[in-house]
Amino acid sequence: MSKLNIIFAGTPDFAAQHLQALLDSEHNVIAVYTQPDKPAGRGKKLQASPVKQLAEQHNIPVYQPKSLRKEDAQAELKALNADVMVVVAYGLILPEAVLNAPKYGCLNVHGSLLPRWRGAAPIQRSIWAGDQETGVTIMQMDIGLDTGDMLHKVTTPIAADETSASLYAKLAELAPPALLEVLNGLESQAFKAEKQDEALSNYAEKLSKEEAKLDWNLTACQLERNIRAFNPWPISFLTLEVDGVEQSVKVYQANVLPHQAKAAGTVLQADKNGIQIATQEGVLNITQLQPSGKKPMSVQDFLNGRADWFAVGKQL
């Protein structure tokens, strides 16, 4: 195995963990591409991405083009003469000229077992859909959206209480060693490229705040999966009327109970064991929630002083 000159492209913390693995390896990271600094926090000060922060700590040149479609940006990248470009949650589309610039093209670390979930939110959608397992795919990028040939996959089970936050953490542990395996075998072609089966592909649509609102016309099983999939963002929530004012309550944890006899959205019970609400099929038993302006709390703490919010028989 010879040392590779690598361009790394990524933006969030998930990507920074891969960059750290490359920095700790035998390979040479010659440049980093990341999204432009964005306003963040109350003061809306420009904030560098986790990837940029890490690159600067190691004195690696950082490039932050708004787009890679312009010829000058493409020429700048090509002039780096990289052996390979590694892309992890970068957030910009790579035109064909960029894909072809490095000697071995561009590799992508994708957070699902392709072709199962292509697109923006594969980790969240695997929980949302009730998948039993997921993993990461290291693939050779082409001009399609996550359609390139697969080089290596690593799988992990999805636990019954898995949230997107915990699954991100799992995949952030699994993926960097898998990426290094592929990079170490790149010159010898140790990993054979496998075409994706188009018939098995699904598009992992971005999550939205609108989708996070609990819809009692869905099944309790689906709602419970949504609560886990939408944690840490955008967090599932319900709305209800209290003294003529609409209140929004975020929901962090719930479980499913089989019985049901009332119309969807009816409060069946509210005590220290949970707030039971009828759904289209089954009962959603909410055990951790957060009223506006407060921290997440147990159902027991919530009901202290708010028992009337979920009166038995109330229709949400």
Swiss-Prot record:
Source domain of life: Bacteria
Catalytic activity: L-methionyl-tRNA(fMet) + (6R)-10-formyltetrahydrofolate = N-formyl-L-methionyl-tRNA(fMet) + (6S)-5,6,7,8-tetrahydrofolate + H(+)
One cellular component (GO) term of this entry: cytosol
EC number from the UniProt entry: 2.1.2.9
Stated name of the protein: Methionyl-tRNA formyltransferase
Similarity-based family: Belongs to the Fmt family.
UniProtKB keywords: Protein biosynthesis, Transferase
Role according to the record: Attaches a formyl group to the free amino group of methionyl-tRNA(fMet). The formyl group appears to play a dual role in the initiator identity of N-formylmethionyl-tRNA by promoting its recognition by IF2 and preventing the misappropriation of this tRNA by the elongation apparatus.
Chain positions recorded as (6S)-5,6,7,8-tetrahydrofolate binding sites: 112-115
Gene: fmt
Organism, as annotated: Actinobacillus pleuropneumoniae serotype 3 (strain JL03)
HAMAP family referenced in this protein's UniProt entry, alphabetically: Formyl_trans
Pfam families: Formyl_trans_C, Formyl_trans_N
Any GO molecular function: methionyl-tRNA formyltransferase activity
